[in-house]
Amino acid sequence: MTAQIIDGNLLSQQLRKDVAVRAAALTAKGKQPGLAVILVGADPASQVYVRNKVKACEDNGLYSLLEKYDADMTEAALLARIAALNADPKIHGILVQMPLPKHIDSNKVIEAISPRKDVDGYSVLSAGELLTGLPGFRPCTPYGCMKLIESTGTKLAGKHAVVIGRSNTVGKPMALLLLQANATVTICHSGTADLAYHTRQADVVVAATGRRNTLTAEMIKPGAIVIDVGINRDDNGKLCGDVDFANAKEVASYITPVPGGVGPMTITMLLVNTIEAAERETN
C-alpha cells in the first residue's frame, strides 16, 4: 500500500476561491474584510510568514494592514496599537506574529485583542468557546488539519485519533476539534510512556511535536490517516516534518507532505476566520 498524498496546496486553492467570493460580496456592501498583522522585531522566519499572510489577503480580496516595529518596542506601545486596531472599523481581524521579544508578555498581548477580532483563536475566551462547543474562532492550524482530514471523505465518528503534542496552539485545540467530530481521542506528549503503543491503535494520527521522526512507519497502523504539522530541517537543511514521510507513506492510507500539507492550510483558515469576523460584524 502506498498512501494517497493529501495536497494542502490544492485544497487551500479551492477554499480560497470561496474566500474570494465571500470577500467580494462583503466589499460590494462597503464592508471589505480587513486583517491587521503586527510584526515586532526582525525574526527571519516571522518575516516570511507575515509576507505570505499579507499576500494571501491581497490575492483574495481582503484589505491587509502590515505594521512592522523594532524589537525594542515597549509592551505598552504594542498594547496601545492593539487598542487602536480594536476600535478601527476597517479591521476585522488582528494577528500579532509570534514569537515576540522576551520583554513583551505574549499572553497579555493576546488577551488585549478584541474577542471579535481574535482570528488566530489564541485567547482564553476563544479556547473556552472551543472547549464548551460555542461558536467562535478555531486556531488556524488545527482548523486546517480538520479540513485536510475531511477532504479524504473519512467520517471521524467512532474512529480512534491520536494527537502527539499538547501545545495550546495545536495539540490541545486539535484534540477538541476531533472530539467535536465524535472521534475517540488520545493525547500523547513527552511524558507518554509508550508512544508507539498508542499510535499503532490509531485510525488518525496528528503529529505536532516539532521533532523529526517522532512518528516512524512501524508506529503506524496500516491504513491510518497521518497529518504532519511539524516544520523541521533534515541533516541537509531540507524542510521536513515530524513524520518519517518516505517510509510512513508505505503504511498509511492518506498522508500530508512537508512542505505542501498543513502549512498552506494554516494561512487559508486565517483568511476564513477573518471573513467570518467580517460577516458577523456586517450581520
From Swiss-Prot:
One of its GO terms (molecular function) is methylenetetrahydrofolate dehydrogenase (NADP+) activity. Pathway: One-carbon metabolism; tetrahydrofolate interconversion. GO terms for cellular component: cytosol. One of its GO terms (biological process) is methionine biosynthetic process. NADP(+) binds at residues 165-167, 190, 231. It catalyses: (6R)-5,10-methylene-5,6,7,8-tetrahydrofolate + NADP(+) = (6R)-5,10-methenyltetrahydrofolate + NADPH; (6R)-5,10-methenyltetrahydrofolate + H2O = (6R)-10-formyltetrahydrofolate + H(+). NCBIfam families: PRK10792.1 (NF008058), PRK14186.1 (NF010783), PRK14189.1 (NF010786). Homodimer. Catalyzes the oxidation of 5,10-methylenetetrahydrofolate to 5,10-methenyltetrahydrofolate and then the hydrolysis of 5,10-methenyltetrahydrofolate to 10-formyltetrahydrofolate. This is Bifunctional protein FolD. It comes from Janthinobacterium sp. (strain Marseille).
